[in-house]
């Protein structure tokens, strides 16, 4: 199974790096495509794309990850869509977005880039999982990543287009 990992906090987020390593250790083929900037609050937007402003990306390295990683100059939903279209290899079976630095509950999900990436996946029949954290002293990335990996089995058995939001 191929997993696309993205987020809205940007490619350099330590939580994203930890999640990528743990999902890969769980047996998934992992590709990371995340914004090159903090894209918090972008929802499911695609950003501005035109002939004058094409989509740029660069290859990155994530310590301890065998899979590829890319920083894309666009919001998380664009990371999902370009991955679905084959820009970074085979289409993913699941999109995992996060872990976000802060909750995504209630009305805030409408504006969340983390949730927006997972919702963009379901538009193409791909399962999605948005992951967010609330406690920041310290950030408990390891725990959030363990819960994420635990949810992947049931999620992969769920119908296509299933999206979960873990907080």
Where in this protein do the model-derived segments appear?
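Electrostatically charged, flexible surface regions
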Residues: 143-167
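Short, Asp-centered acidic motifs that coordinate Mg2+ and/or phosphate
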Residues: 94
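Alpha-helix C-terminal capping segments
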Residues: 83-89, 116-127
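A cross-family phosphate/adenosyl-ligand binding-site feature
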Residues: 3-6, 13-86, 90-91
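Glycine-rich phosphate/pyrophosphate-binding loops
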Residues: 122-144
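Proline-centered loop/turn at the N-terminus of a beta-strand
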Residues: 2, 29, 125-127, 162
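Short beta-strand segments
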Residues: 6, 33-35, 97-100, 131-132, ...
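Glycine/threonine-rich flexible loop motifs
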Residues: 103-112
């Amino acid at each position: 199974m191929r997993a696309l990992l993205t987020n809205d906090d940007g490619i350099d987020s330590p939580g994203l790096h930890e999640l990528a390593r743990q999902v890969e250790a769980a047996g998934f083929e992992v590709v990371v495509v995340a914004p090159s900037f903090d894209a918090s609050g972008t929802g499911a937007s695609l950003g501005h794309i035109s002939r004058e402003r094409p989509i740029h990306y660069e290859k990155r390295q994530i310590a301890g990850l065998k899979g590829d990683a890319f920083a894309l100059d666009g919001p998380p939903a664009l990371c999902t869509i370009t991955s679905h279209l084959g820009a970074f290899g085979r289409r993913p079976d699941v999109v995992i977005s996060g872990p976000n630095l802060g909750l995504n509950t209630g009305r805030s999900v409408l504006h969340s880039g983390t949730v927006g990436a997972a919702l963009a996946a379901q538009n193409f029949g791909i399962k999605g999982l948005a992951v967010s954290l609330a406690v920041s002293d310290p950030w408990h990335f390891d725990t959030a990543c363990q819960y994420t990996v635990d949810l992947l089995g049931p999620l992969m058995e769920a119908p296509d287009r299933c999206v979960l939001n873990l907080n």
